[in-house]
Swiss-Prot record:
Record organism: Corynebacterium diphtheriae (strain ATCC 700971 / NCTC 13129 / Biotype gravis)
Protein known as: Probable dual-specificity RNA methyltransferase RlmN
Ranges where the Radical SAM core domain occurs: 117-355
NCBIfam families on file: rRNA_mod_RlmN
Cofactor: [4Fe-4S] cluster
Similarity comment: family membership: Belongs to the radical SAM superfamily. RlmN family.
Reaction(s) catalysed (UniProt annotation): adenosine(2503) in 23S rRNA + 2 reduced [2Fe-2S]-[ferredoxin] + 2 S-adenosyl-L-methionine = 2-methyladenosine(2503) in 23S rRNA + 5'-deoxyadenosine + L-methionine + 2 oxidized [2Fe-2S]-[ferredoxin] + S-adenosyl-L-homocysteine; adenosine(37) in tRNA + 2 reduced [2Fe-2S]-[ferredoxin] + 2 S-adenosyl-L-methionine = 2-methyladenosine(37) in tRNA + 5'-deoxyadenosine + L-methionine + 2 oxidized [2Fe-2S]-[ferredoxin] + S-adenosyl-L-homocysteine
Residues noted as binding [4Fe-4S] cluster in the record, renumbered to the chain: 131, 135, 138
Residues annotated for S-adenosyl-L-methionine binding in this entry: 181-182, 215, 238-240, 317
Main location class: cytoplasm
Alphabetically ordered keywords of this record: 4Fe-4S, Cytoplasm, Disulfide bond, Iron, Iron-sulfur, Metal-binding, Methyltransferase, rRNA processing, S-adenosyl-L-methionine, Transferase, tRNA processing
Catalytic activity, EC: 2.1.1.192
Length: 368
């Protein structure tokens, strides 16, 4: 990890690499019909192909046997470029957590994490290759931004994990945009992916909007824009401290949108969506874990969001080269109690995948 005393710059809009060829999942319903028409195929084939992709979780048209044999190769070449190739999959938590490293068409790397629980299966997906938000305690942020992912690259992470769960006799039930990247910095493609994830087959995978979480470091205008999409996904705001002075360092976007503006936007989202906002808070020993910060956090959240908020405390996950580590257990417990005392619910999140660098803030997509 880059030395936190030498901050890297924010990067919102200057990815260094090229986007992949257009994929079926990148196209609207009308665009799919037009693309098939150019191949000499009738429009009903678009629905047929969608049922294979979203319903049967097939990404190779050669397996779509209800398509004419002569059409399968055409469809594959025109609409199903290979977006991702698995490089490596590593497991933790007795096989219940699996981190997959993917190589994209241009050599860019990304990671996704599948977490199996007794009553659900959650996929943590990436929205960008790398991240431009430059948070000094996060391995992804310190690695910088390669490029935005296409809608197809985001959606295909979900299809691949859904196929894995289906092969095991299970079902992928939850999606969290908490992998690599700032989702709201790739706004249009992320919203398109959310709609495909949550639409019923054959328009999408049929995962409930209430089981989808979109995280952000606090891009206030984009939070308000998301609220106006009339979605009911959970918004998770990575706050990490309630005071602007420290947050300017921990979350550099705070120099553009301060805590009050972020919380105002979060309240707007809660009011429009009817959903409780999740506040993510990485507890860092002797940095942001003081009792007075817990009091301030609880007071600010209660004032801004009332009952429409829950705090997830995340003991800082170790990253290579970082000078920081997690708060001790007794301080975690005190922090929880002091936030709750201000009328805000608060829990310490169960951390999965730490030993394989699959936990929050650890994804670095390294080919090692």
């Amino acid at each position: 990890m880059t030395n936190p005393t030498k901050p890297i710059p924010l990067n919102f809009d200057k990815p260094r690499r090229f986007m992949p060829p257009k994929h079926f999942a990148d196209l609207s319903a009308d665009e799919r019909i037009d693309a098939l028409k150019e191949l000499g195929l009738p429009k009903f084939r678009a629905n047929q192909i969608a049922r294979h992709y979203y319903g049967r979780l097939e990404a190779d048209p050669s397996t779509m046997t209800d398509l004419p044999a002569a059409a399968r190769e055409k469809v594959k070449d025109a609409l199903f470029p290979q977006l991702m190739q698995p490089v490596r999959a590593v497991q933790a938590d007795d096989g219940e957590t699996q981190k997959t490293l993917w190589k994209l068409h241009d050599g860019t790397l990304l990671e996704s994490v599948l977490m199996r629980y007794p009553n659900r299966a959650t996929l943590c997906i990436s929205s960008q290759a790398g991240c431009g938000m430059a948070c000094p305690f996060c391995a992804t942020g310190q690695g910088g931004l390669d490029r935005n992912l296409s809608t197809g690259e985001i959606v295909d992470q979900v299809r691949a994990a859904s196929a894995t769960m289906q092969a095991e006799g299970g079902r992928l039930s939850n999606i969290v945009f908490m992998g690599m990247g700032e989702p709201l910095a790739n706004y249009k493609r992320v919203v398109s992916a959310v709609r495909q994830i949550t639409a019923p087959v054959p328009e999408g995978f049929g995962i409930s909007q209430r089981n989808v979480t979109v995280s952000t470091v606090g891009l206030a205008p984009a939070i308000r824009k998301l609220a106006d999409e009339d979605l009911s996904v959970t918004l998770a705001v990575s706050l990490h401290t309630p005071d602007d002075e420290l947050r300017n360092t921990l979350v550099p976007t705070n120099n553009r949108w301060e805590v009050a503006e972020v919380l105002d936007a979060a309240r707007y989202y809660a009011d429009r969506s009817g959903r409780r906002v999740s506040i993510e808070y990485a507890l860092i020993r002797d940095v942001n874990d003081q009792g007075w910060r817990a009091d301030m956090l609880g007071k600010k959240l209660h004032k801004a969001l009332g009952p429409l908020v829950h705090v997830n405390l995340i003991p800082l996950n170790p990253t290579p080269g970082s000078k920081w580590d997690a708060s001790p257990m007794d301080r975690q417990k005190e922090f929880v109690q002091r936030v709750i005392a201000q009328g805000v619910t608060c829990t310490v999140r169960d951390t999965r995948g730490q030993e394989i660098a699959a936990a929050c803030g650890q994804l670095a997509a390294e080919e090692r």
